[in-house]
Protein backbone atom coordinates (compact mmCIF):
# COMPACT_ATOMS: atom_id res chain seq x y z
CA UNK A 1 0.00 0.00 0.00
CA UNK A 2 2.77 2.44 0.88
CA UNK A 3 4.42 1.90 -2.54
CA UNK A 4 1.17 2.95 -4.22
CA UNK A 5 0.84 6.02 -2.02
CA UNK A 6 4.45 7.01 -2.77
CA UNK A 7 3.83 6.95 -6.54
CA UNK A 8 3.11 10.05 -8.64
CA UNK A 9 1.23 12.56 -6.46
CA UNK A 10 -2.34 13.37 -7.31
CA UNK A 11 -5.66 14.24 -5.79
CA UNK A 12 -6.67 10.58 -5.89
CA UNK A 13 -3.69 9.54 -3.80
CA UNK A 14 -4.29 12.35 -1.34
CA UNK A 15 -7.98 11.45 -1.01
CA UNK A 16 -7.21 7.76 -0.51
CA UNK A 17 -4.50 8.56 2.05
CA UNK A 18 -6.83 10.70 4.13
CA UNK A 19 -9.59 8.13 3.69
CA UNK A 20 -7.33 5.39 5.06
CA UNK A 21 -6.31 7.70 7.90
CA UNK A 22 -9.97 8.27 8.74
CA UNK A 23 -10.56 4.51 8.60
CA UNK A 24 -7.68 3.90 11.01
CA UNK A 25 -9.10 6.56 13.33
CA UNK A 26 -12.46 4.77 13.31
CA UNK A 27 -10.74 1.46 14.07
CA UNK A 28 -8.84 3.02 16.97
CA UNK A 29 -11.99 4.71 18.29
CA UNK A 30 -13.74 1.35 18.12
CA UNK A 31 -10.87 -0.22 20.03
CA UNK A 32 -11.01 2.51 22.69
CA UNK A 33 -14.77 2.04 23.04
CA UNK A 34 -14.59 -1.68 23.62
CA UNK A 35 -11.26 -1.66 25.47
CA UNK A 36 -12.95 0.45 28.15
CA UNK A 37 -15.87 -1.98 28.19
CA UNK A 38 -13.51 -4.99 28.34
CA UNK A 39 -11.60 -3.36 31.18
CA UNK A 40 -14.78 -2.83 33.18
CA UNK A 41 -16.01 -6.38 32.48
CA UNK A 42 -12.68 -8.02 33.36
CA UNK A 43 -12.31 -5.98 36.54
CA UNK A 44 -15.90 -6.78 37.45
CA UNK A 45 -15.20 -10.50 36.98
CA UNK A 46 -12.05 -10.31 39.12
CA UNK A 47 -13.94 -8.46 41.85
CA UNK A 48 -16.96 -10.76 41.84
CA UNK A 49 -19.23 -8.30 40.02
CA UNK A 50 -21.11 -8.46 36.72
CA UNK A 51 -19.94 -5.17 35.25
CA UNK A 52 -21.94 -3.18 32.66
CA UNK A 53 -25.12 -5.14 31.86
CA UNK A 54 -27.93 -2.69 31.05
CA UNK A 55 -27.17 -0.57 27.98
CA UNK A 56 -26.95 -2.62 24.80
CA UNK A 57 -28.17 -5.92 26.20
CA UNK A 58 -26.96 -8.14 29.02
CA UNK A 59 -23.35 -7.71 27.91
CA UNK A 60 -23.58 -3.92 28.07
CA UNK A 61 -22.17 -3.54 24.54
CA UNK A 62 -23.35 0.07 24.21
CA UNK A 63 -22.44 1.21 27.71
CA UNK A 64 -19.30 3.06 26.58
CA UNK A 65 -21.20 4.68 23.70
CA UNK A 66 -23.78 5.98 26.18
CA UNK A 67 -20.99 7.22 28.46
CA UNK A 68 -19.38 9.10 25.56
CA UNK A 69 -22.67 10.75 24.60
CA UNK A 70 -23.19 11.80 28.20
CA UNK A 71 -19.62 13.12 28.33
CA UNK A 72 -20.05 15.24 25.20
CA UNK A 73 -23.20 16.82 26.65
CA UNK A 74 -21.42 17.97 29.79
CA UNK A 75 -20.67 21.66 30.25
CA UNK A 76 -17.26 22.80 29.03
CA UNK A 77 -15.91 24.87 31.90
CA UNK A 78 -12.65 26.83 32.01
CA UNK A 79 -11.40 27.96 35.44
CA UNK A 80 -11.36 31.72 35.87
CA UNK A 81 -7.71 31.72 36.97
CA UNK A 82 -6.53 29.36 34.21
CA UNK A 83 -4.20 30.36 31.36
CA UNK A 84 -6.93 30.09 28.72
CA UNK A 85 -4.88 29.62 25.49
CA UNK A 86 -2.66 26.93 27.00
CA UNK A 87 -5.59 25.34 28.82
CA UNK A 88 -7.46 24.94 25.52
CA UNK A 89 -4.38 23.80 23.57
CA UNK A 90 -3.08 21.21 26.07
CA UNK A 91 -5.57 18.38 25.29
CA UNK A 92 -4.82 18.70 21.57
CA UNK A 93 -1.07 18.57 22.20
CA UNK A 94 -1.57 15.47 24.34
CA UNK A 95 -3.76 13.63 21.82
CA UNK A 96 -2.14 14.43 18.45
CA UNK A 97 1.14 12.49 18.98
CA UNK A 98 -0.81 9.43 20.13
CA UNK A 99 -2.42 9.20 16.69
CA UNK A 100 0.76 10.14 14.81
CA UNK A 101 2.69 7.13 16.12
CA UNK A 102 0.20 4.75 14.49
CA UNK A 103 1.56 5.69 11.05
CA UNK A 104 4.82 3.85 11.74
CA UNK A 105 3.27 0.61 13.03
CA UNK A 106 3.03 -2.29 10.53
CA UNK A 107 -0.07 -4.33 11.37
CA UNK A 108 0.53 -6.97 8.71
CA UNK A 109 3.12 -7.57 6.00
CA UNK A 110 0.89 -5.70 3.53
CA UNK A 111 -0.93 -3.14 5.69
CA UNK A 112 1.16 -0.23 6.94
CA UNK A 113 0.95 3.47 6.31
CA UNK A 114 4.64 4.35 6.22
CA UNK A 115 7.69 2.12 5.93
CA UNK A 116 9.94 4.38 8.01
CA UNK A 117 13.59 3.36 8.09
CA UNK A 118 13.86 4.39 11.73
CA UNK A 119 10.31 3.50 12.74
CA UNK A 120 11.25 2.58 16.30
CA UNK A 121 13.06 5.88 16.80
CA UNK A 122 10.09 7.73 15.29
CA UNK A 123 7.69 6.07 17.74
CA UNK A 124 9.82 6.87 20.79
CA UNK A 125 10.45 10.47 19.72
CA UNK A 126 6.85 11.33 18.83
CA UNK A 127 5.27 9.57 21.81
CA UNK A 128 7.35 11.67 24.18
CA UNK A 129 5.62 14.83 22.93
CA UNK A 130 2.42 13.91 24.78
CA UNK A 131 4.11 14.74 28.07
CA UNK A 132 4.37 18.36 26.91
CA UNK A 133 0.58 18.49 26.64
CA UNK A 134 0.17 16.88 30.06
CA UNK A 135 2.55 19.31 31.78
CA UNK A 136 1.00 22.24 29.91
CA UNK A 137 -2.49 21.21 31.00
CA UNK A 138 -1.38 20.83 34.60
CA UNK A 139 0.33 24.22 34.68
CA UNK A 140 -2.39 26.09 32.76
CA UNK A 141 -5.12 24.82 35.10
CA UNK A 142 -3.67 26.93 37.95
CA UNK A 143 -4.40 24.08 40.36
CA UNK A 144 -1.84 22.61 42.73
CA UNK A 145 -3.06 19.04 42.23
CA UNK A 146 -3.03 19.42 38.44
CA UNK A 147 0.47 20.91 38.48
CA UNK A 148 1.79 18.16 40.75
CA UNK A 149 0.25 15.54 38.46
CA UNK A 150 1.86 17.13 35.42
CA UNK A 151 5.27 17.25 37.09
CA UNK A 152 4.92 13.62 38.15
CA UNK A 153 4.10 12.68 34.56
CA UNK A 154 7.23 14.46 33.29
CA UNK A 155 9.48 12.86 35.91
CA UNK A 156 8.00 9.44 35.25
CA UNK A 157 8.40 9.74 31.48
CA UNK A 158 12.04 10.84 31.77
CA UNK A 159 12.84 8.05 34.24
CA UNK A 160 11.24 5.18 32.33
CA UNK A 161 11.97 6.34 28.79
CA UNK A 162 15.65 5.53 29.33
CA UNK A 163 15.30 1.82 30.27
CA UNK A 164 12.56 1.45 27.63
CA UNK A 165 14.88 2.71 24.88
CA UNK A 166 17.89 0.78 26.16
CA UNK A 167 15.94 -2.48 26.36
CA UNK A 168 14.80 -1.93 22.77
CA UNK A 169 18.47 -1.56 21.74
CA UNK A 170 18.93 -5.29 22.30
CA UNK A 171 16.24 -5.96 19.72
CA UNK A 172 17.85 -3.47 17.33
CA UNK A 173 21.23 -5.20 17.74
CA UNK A 174 19.78 -8.60 16.87
CA UNK A 175 17.66 -7.33 13.97
CA UNK A 176 20.33 -4.97 12.65
CA UNK A 177 17.73 -2.31 11.92
CA UNK A 178 15.33 0.17 13.52
CA UNK A 179 12.80 -0.48 10.77
CA UNK A 180 9.83 -2.21 12.42
CA UNK A 181 9.16 -4.38 9.35
CA UNK A 182 12.77 -5.58 9.38
CA UNK A 183 12.47 -6.34 13.11
CA UNK A 184 9.43 -8.54 12.46
CA UNK A 185 11.22 -10.23 9.54
CA UNK A 186 14.21 -11.00 11.80
CA UNK A 187 11.87 -13.03 14.05
CA UNK A 188 11.01 -15.51 11.32
CA UNK A 189 12.86 -18.32 13.14
CA UNK A 190 12.64 -17.28 16.80
CA UNK A 191 10.63 -14.55 18.47
CA UNK A 192 12.68 -12.02 20.38
CA UNK A 193 10.77 -12.71 23.60
CA UNK A 194 12.82 -15.94 23.71
CA UNK A 195 16.07 -14.40 22.46
CA UNK A 196 15.69 -11.29 24.67
CA UNK A 197 13.67 -12.32 27.78
CA UNK A 198 15.33 -9.72 30.02
CA UNK A 199 14.77 -6.98 27.46
CA UNK A 200 11.10 -7.98 27.17
CA UNK A 201 10.63 -7.82 30.94
CA UNK A 202 12.28 -4.39 31.18
CA UNK A 203 10.43 -3.04 28.15
CA UNK A 204 7.07 -4.28 29.39
CA UNK A 205 7.48 -2.76 32.86
CA UNK A 206 8.71 0.53 31.40
CA UNK A 207 5.79 0.50 28.93
CA UNK A 208 3.30 0.16 31.80
CA UNK A 209 4.92 3.19 33.43
CA UNK A 210 4.89 5.13 30.15
CA UNK A 211 1.17 4.43 29.82
CA UNK A 212 0.54 5.67 33.37
CA UNK A 213 -1.21 2.40 34.11
CA UNK A 214 -1.51 0.69 37.48
CA UNK A 215 0.71 0.21 39.46
CA UNK A 216 2.48 3.26 37.99
CA UNK A 217 -0.50 5.63 37.70
CA UNK A 218 1.07 8.30 39.93
CA UNK A 219 0.19 11.28 37.66
CA UNK A 220 -3.53 10.48 38.00
CA UNK A 221 -3.61 9.08 41.53
CA UNK A 222 -7.21 9.70 42.61
CA UNK A 223 -6.53 9.14 46.30
CA UNK A 224 -3.62 11.61 46.28
CA UNK A 225 -4.15 14.16 43.49
CA UNK A 226 -7.91 14.07 42.80
CA UNK A 227 -7.33 12.77 39.22
CA UNK A 228 -4.09 14.68 38.75
CA UNK A 229 -3.27 16.81 35.73
CA UNK A 230 -6.80 16.80 34.24
CA UNK A 231 -8.67 17.53 37.46
CA UNK A 232 -9.94 20.88 36.09
CA UNK A 233 -10.98 19.48 32.70
CA UNK A 234 -14.50 18.37 31.79
CA UNK A 235 -16.52 17.41 28.74
CA UNK A 236 -14.80 16.82 25.43
CA UNK A 237 -11.49 18.37 26.60
CA UNK A 238 -11.20 15.72 29.31
CA UNK A 239 -12.16 13.15 26.66
CA UNK A 240 -9.05 14.09 24.65
CA UNK A 241 -6.81 13.13 27.57
CA UNK A 242 -8.66 9.86 28.10
CA UNK A 243 -8.61 9.11 24.37
CA UNK A 244 -4.85 9.71 24.22
CA UNK A 245 -4.34 7.25 27.08
CA UNK A 246 -6.23 4.46 25.35
CA UNK A 247 -4.78 5.17 21.90
CA UNK A 248 -1.34 4.76 23.47
CA UNK A 249 -2.55 1.49 24.98
CA UNK A 250 -3.42 0.40 21.43
CA UNK A 251 -0.08 1.59 20.05
CA UNK A 252 2.08 0.15 22.84
CA UNK A 253 0.39 -3.25 22.68
CA UNK A 254 1.02 -3.27 18.92
CA UNK A 255 4.66 -2.21 19.42
CA UNK A 256 5.31 -4.97 21.98
CA UNK A 257 3.76 -7.46 19.55
CA UNK A 258 6.08 -6.22 16.79
CA UNK A 259 9.28 -6.09 18.85
CA UNK A 260 9.02 -9.27 20.89
CA UNK A 261 6.12 -11.51 19.78
CA UNK A 262 7.01 -11.89 16.13
CA UNK A 263 4.38 -9.52 14.78
CA UNK A 264 2.26 -11.42 12.26
CA UNK A 265 4.47 -14.54 12.27
CA UNK A 266 2.48 -17.66 13.22
CA UNK A 267 3.18 -20.28 15.84
CA UNK A 268 4.90 -23.36 14.41
CA UNK A 269 2.64 -25.74 12.42
CA UNK A 270 -0.18 -23.18 12.34
CA UNK A 271 0.98 -21.17 9.36
CA UNK A 272 -2.35 -21.66 7.59
CA UNK A 273 -3.91 -19.09 9.93
CA UNK A 274 -3.58 -15.57 8.42
CA UNK A 275 -0.90 -13.28 9.85
CA UNK A 276 -3.46 -10.61 10.69
CA UNK A 277 -5.22 -13.08 13.00
CA UNK A 278 -1.97 -13.89 14.78
CA UNK A 279 -1.20 -10.21 15.22
CA UNK A 280 -4.67 -9.61 16.67
CA UNK A 281 -4.37 -12.55 19.09
CA UNK A 282 -0.98 -11.43 20.41
CA UNK A 283 -2.21 -7.85 20.62
CA UNK A 284 -5.28 -8.85 22.64
CA UNK A 285 -3.13 -10.93 25.00
CA UNK A 286 -0.97 -7.88 25.80
CA UNK A 287 -4.05 -5.69 26.34
CA UNK A 288 -5.54 -8.31 28.67
CA UNK A 289 -2.39 -8.43 30.78
CA UNK A 290 -2.42 -4.63 31.12
CA UNK A 291 -6.06 -4.77 32.25
CA UNK A 292 -5.23 -7.59 34.64
CA UNK A 293 -2.49 -5.44 36.20
CA UNK A 294 -5.03 -2.74 37.01
CA UNK A 295 -7.26 -5.19 38.87
CA UNK A 296 -4.37 -6.83 40.73
CA UNK A 297 -1.58 -4.52 41.85
CA UNK A 298 -1.68 -1.63 44.33
CA UNK A 299 -0.21 1.74 43.40
CA UNK A 300 3.46 2.21 44.33
CA UNK A 301 4.79 5.28 46.11
CA UNK A 302 6.43 8.05 44.11
CA UNK A 303 9.86 7.44 45.67
CA UNK A 304 9.61 3.70 44.97
CA UNK A 305 8.68 4.48 41.37
CA UNK A 306 11.80 6.58 40.82
CA UNK A 307 14.13 4.20 42.66
CA UNK A 308 12.89 1.23 40.66
CA UNK A 309 13.62 2.98 37.37
CA UNK A 310 17.10 4.26 38.21
CA UNK A 311 18.37 1.53 40.55
CA UNK A 312 16.83 -1.60 39.01
CA UNK A 313 15.66 -1.20 35.41
CA UNK A 314 18.50 1.02 34.19
CA UNK A 315 21.34 -1.29 35.40
CA UNK A 316 19.50 -4.34 34.06
CA UNK A 317 19.05 -2.69 30.67
CA UNK A 318 22.79 -1.94 30.55
CA UNK A 319 23.57 -5.56 31.40
CA UNK A 320 21.21 -6.71 28.64
CA UNK A 321 22.93 -4.51 26.05
CA UNK A 322 26.37 -5.89 26.98
CA UNK A 323 25.16 -9.51 26.92
CA UNK A 324 23.41 -8.99 23.59
CA UNK A 325 26.51 -7.40 22.05
CA UNK A 326 28.71 -10.29 23.25
CA UNK A 327 26.28 -12.94 21.98
CA UNK A 328 25.88 -11.10 18.68
CA UNK A 329 29.65 -10.92 18.14
CA UNK A 330 30.28 -14.56 19.08
CA UNK A 331 27.38 -16.43 17.52
CA UNK A 332 25.95 -14.27 14.73
From Swiss-Prot:
Transmembrane parts of this sequence: 16-36, 87-107, 116-136, 164-184, 190-210, 231-251, 253-273, 277-297, 312-332
Keywords: Cell membrane, Membrane, NAD, Quinone, Translocase, Transmembrane, Transmembrane helix, Ubiquinone
InterPro entries noted in UniProt: NADH_UbQ_OxRdtase_su1/FPO, NADH_UbQ_OxRdtase_su1_CS
A GO CC term assigned to this protein in UniProt: plasma membrane
Recorded topology in the membrane: Multi-pass membrane protein
UniProt catalytic activity: a quinone + NADH + 5 H(+)(in) = a quinol + NAD(+) + 4 H(+)(out)
Localisation: Cell membrane
One GO term (biological process): aerobic respiration
Signal peptide coordinates: none
Cross-referenced Pfam families: NADHdh
Enzyme class (EC, first level): translocase
Enzyme Commission numbers on file: 7.1.1.-
Record carries keyword NAD: yes
GO MF terms, alphabetically ordered: NADH dehydrogenase activity; oxidoreductase activity, acting on NAD(P)H, quinone or similar compound as acceptor; quinone binding
Keyword Cell membrane recorded: yes
PANTHER family membership: NADH DEHYDROGENASE SUBUNIT 1, NADH-UBIQUINONE OXIDOREDUCTASE CHAIN 1
HAMAP family per record: NDH1_NuoH
Alphabetized NCBIfam families for the sequence: PRK06076.1-2 (NF004741)
Assembly: NDH-1 is composed of 14 different subunits. Subunits NuoA, H, J, K, L, M, N constitute the membrane sector of the complex.
Described function: NDH-1 shuttles electrons from NADH, via FMN and iron-sulfur (Fe-S) centers, to quinones in the respiratory chain. The immediate electron acceptor for the enzyme in this species is believed to be ubiquinone. Couples the redox reaction to proton translocation (for every two electrons transferred, four hydrogen ions are translocated across the cytoplasmic membrane), and thus conserves the redox energy in a proton gradient. This subunit may bind ubiquinone.
Family: Belongs to the complex I subunit 1 family.
Name of the featured protein: NADH-quinone oxidoreductase subunit H
Originating species: Geobacillus thermodenitrificans (strain NG80-2)
Source taxonomy: Bacteria, Bacillati, Bacillota, Bacilli, Bacillales
Chain's gene name: nuoH
Amino acid sequence: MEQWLESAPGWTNVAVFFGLGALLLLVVLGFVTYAILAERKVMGFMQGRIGPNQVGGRLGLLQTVADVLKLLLKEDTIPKAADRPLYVLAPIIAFTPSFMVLAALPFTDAFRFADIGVGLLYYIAVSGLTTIGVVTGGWASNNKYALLGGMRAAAQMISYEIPLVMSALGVVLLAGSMNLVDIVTAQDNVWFIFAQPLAFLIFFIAAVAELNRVPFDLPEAESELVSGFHVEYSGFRWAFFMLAEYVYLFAMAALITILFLGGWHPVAFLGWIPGSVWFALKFCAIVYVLIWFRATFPRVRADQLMEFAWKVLLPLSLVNIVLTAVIKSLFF
